[in-house]
Amino acid sequence: MRNSLLDVADLTTVFETSNQKVIAVNDVTISVNRGKTLGLVGESGSGKSVTAMSILRLVSAPGKIESGSITFSIDDTSIDLLSESDSNLRKIRGGRIAMIFQEPMTSLNPVYTTGYQVMEAILLHKKMSREEAKQKTIELFHEVGIPNPSDRIHMYPHEMSGGQRQRVMIAMALSCSPDLLIADEPTTALDVTIQAQILTLLRQLCVNRNMGMIFITHDLGVIAEIADDVAVMYRGNIVEHSDVLSIFTKCKHPYTKSLLLCRPMLSGNIKRLPTVSDFMETELQDDGSLKILEKSVSDESLRRVEEKGRGRHLYPLKRLAQLGYSALRDDYEEGISCAGEAESPLVSVSDLKVHFPVRRGIFSRVSRWVKAVDGVTFDVYRGQTLGLVGESGCGKTTTGRCLMRLINPTSGTFMFGGIDISKMSQSELRPYRKRFQIIFQDPYGSLNPRKTIEEIITEPMRFHGMGVSRQDRQQKALELLEKVGLPGAQYLKRYPHEFSGGQRQRVCIARALAVDPELIICDEAVSALDVSVQAQVLNLLKDLQSELGLTYIFISHDLSVVKFMSDMMAVMKNGRFVEFGPSECIYKDPKNEYTRELIRSIPNVNIEQIKSRQNSQI
């Protein structure tokens, strides 16, 4: 049997407009073998997804495949996918080559049950009765680890968790026993525990079914867990292609090195994350090609400085004991006890509860209550960062929005600067609102697409009566853009769609800073960003905190990011804190089993595990 499933040679895909021609994929050559996984890694815009769509010939206008060949093996017969008719290609898509997309909620049809949608794919490609297709769907749900599959096939997408929806997408992709599976960022939107389960599932299915897989991601930590071979893409080009062990032990290209080091690590304490620009710079040549120049990198230039403590940002030991959090490491207690004993907290939360009613019946009677936040107590001191971490649905975002008074609490109190704001009316609260701001998760959805950047940044200034004139507000907007790394008056008249994801998030940060707040709540502020852009934004947030004395509540499901940003950390589960203390202590010596599970689930570059996986497949 031919071992190579797919051979892509010299593939070039372009997008042509009346003004310019953009080369999205440039002379890409890759191959995928049966039972093996090729990891395709790079930033957004590097050409990963366009490569996948080109393989399936799904690139829509104004894009087109300009040159190259795509050879696919079916039953020991090689066919050229670029020359196949549309009717034959439709049989191959879904039947022989299947694809899993990033966001299952938008990929699944909300008006049909999940079981119906999987059955539909089976009936399209296989000669089966509806009853046989239903039984096959139940078997697939069981194979991908969905509990009670005979009941779950009748559930709609919104009735399932994110992890279960992604498992449905995997079941749909596997429904016709494909030879090749293309997984496009299938775990990016998932919590670390669910992500670990999905990676394990995909790895097992690939081996058990002798199926080839292309796994697309921007996270090399995920690549270490699942890939056999790795192709690193940068601006449409493959800049490095090797087996997974070589990528992590002796990578050659500066872009690969930067991706490896941009991720926050669990081991050690660093003040600053390196970025791509620390490793290389690019020059545009006369012929339109890109020349990459490697920089000489030193520990000093990256400022990866080990810290032995965080001085003024530590937590008063006496206050921790009062709150009931006494499980601390002995070597940390002295540092904590000498910090901030006389200082009052900026934010003080006591027994906060937020319960949502579930109504049923024609009279909408309350049948039960969902306890989203169920009695949390904590303090945040000036200049400090508190990290809230946990899985989706644990109550992190509800806690943050309640502190912003975007949601009213069911009970409990929270003080801001010594003043109880938990029971204030909206008119009473208005003078205080400029003292605390929020940065939302999605930089695409949180900016008004109809307003210019100037209007977006100056809007909160006008609302709070700041600035004598429009010129004053415009000047401050310019200063804020420069502060967040977007200098130049030309940015003011642009609209959000003209910016990249990282630039949009910088605009969101500038807007939050517009009213000179004391507290900023960062609600999954970097989870939608690539690791390299994420590093830039995290560094920016730290710089602003140091310069302006800001206080952060940093909400995330990514424990490594929370550890990098936070002085103190609260681990949430089912609306409660299961662990609270200095972030370094929690990582070094977690007391709760749930915290240990979260730490174990973080994608990790373990060289011995990679070697073991390679040896087991020889």
Where would I find each of the regions flagged by the language model?
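Short catalytic/signature loops enriched in Gly
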Residues: 2-4, 147-151, 244-347, 358-364, ...
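Conserved ABC transporter NBD signature motif
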Residues: 65-79, 412-420
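ABC ATPase NBD coupling module
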Residues: 77-98, 246-251, 363-367, 421-437, ...
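Conserved signature/switch motifs of ABC ATPase nucleotide-binding domains
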Residues: 94, 158, 176, 497, ...
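A short, proline-enriched helix->beta-strand linker immediately N-terminal to the Walker B motif
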Residues: 175-179, 514-518, 534
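A short, surface-exposed alpha-helical micro-motif characterized by mixed small hydrophobic
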Residues: 223-225, 562-564
